[in-house]
């Protein structure tokens, strides 16, 4: 998946591009969204916005926010419903209140979908925005070790619930959503976020063009480096830790006890 700095990204001519485009937006990238809207202003047939957050069971859920058309029966819309609705009734009701707004809540992802006509077909630009990468306001210490890196929690976000910190719920949800973004970038086939997008928000296919767009202020940060380039799958981490443990053992009993203590501590925290 291509990764681009916001101000260095060269736009494409969407009206000459037969593929659907999907963008993962990290940081304050409202400028990018607005530019896509302006580029396609005269060709947009449908646009809509959803939000994705985390419920009390720590599961992702989606909510419809707004659109330029209304489906009175469903009280929501997406491209799949739009096509179905047009077949039955012939047209949808224009929603004059459905203006696109920019959202920045750190405990939500916002999905902007622009649907436009291209060579007689409806094509889509889908933009999945994670507006903020939160950091703890105070120093965090776990098992005597100072945690300076938020990516520490990607393999096990539930550790945050065990820490006495301000706004822990907000930080927890932000980390969980970032973990889902990481999975979407690194291995779509097992991504819960991909499933929600494809089933409830916009149809995705193997021919879609995916790109990551990162705000200038975040592009060179270590948070971004680890979010987009590393795999935080827990099973892989467990396998790595077990392999490390086996490789460290020797004929020295005292040294093996120390290694075992460290191994058990790490295994417990993953």
UniProtKB/Swiss-Prot annotation:
Keywords: Late protein, Virion
One GO CC term, this protein: virion component
Induction, per UniProt: Expressed in the late phase of the viral replicative cycle.
Residues making up the signal peptide according to the UniProt record: none
Principal place of residence: virion
Subcellular location: Virion
Family statement: Belongs to the chordopoxvirinae D3 family.
Biological role: Late protein which is part of a large complex required for early virion morphogenesis. This complex participates in the formation of virosomes and the incorporation of virosomal contents into nascent immature virions.
Protein name: 27 kDa core protein
């Amino acid at each position: 998946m291509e990764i681009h700095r916001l101000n260095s990204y060269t736009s494409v001519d969407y009206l000459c591009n037969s593929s659907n485009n999907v963008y993962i937006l990290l940081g304050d990238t409202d400028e990018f969204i607005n530019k896509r809207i302006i580029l396609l202003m005269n060709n947009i047939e449908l646009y809509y916005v959803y939000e994705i957050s985390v419920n009390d069971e720590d599961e992702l859920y989606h909510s419809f926010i707004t659109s330029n058309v209304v489906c009175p029966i469903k009280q929501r819309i997406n491209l799949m419903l739009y096509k179905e609705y047009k077949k039955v009734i012939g047209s949808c009701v224009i929603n004059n209140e459905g203006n696109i707004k920019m959202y920045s809540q750190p405990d939500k992802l916002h999905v902007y979908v622009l649907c436009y006509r291209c060579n007689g077909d409806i094509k889509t630009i889908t933009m999945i925005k994670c507006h903020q990468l939160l950091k703890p306001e105070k120093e965090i210490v776990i098992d005597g070790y100072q945690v300076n890196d938020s990516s520490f929690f990607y393999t096990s976000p539930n550790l945050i619930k065990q820490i006495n910190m301000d706004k822990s719920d907000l930080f927890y949800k932000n980390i969980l959503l970032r973990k889902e973004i990481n999975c979407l970038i690194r291995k779509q086939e097992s991504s819960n976020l991909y499933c929600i997008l494809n089933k409830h928000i916009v149809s995705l296919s193997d021919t879609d063009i995916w790109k990551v767009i990162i705000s200038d202020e975040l592009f060179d940060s270590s948070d971004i480096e680890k979010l987009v380039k590393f795999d935080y799958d827990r099973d892989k981490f467990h396998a790595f830790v077990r392999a490390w443990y086996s490789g460290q053992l020797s004929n020295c009993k005292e040294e093996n006890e120390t290694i075992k203590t460290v191994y058990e501590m790490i295994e417990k925290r993953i």
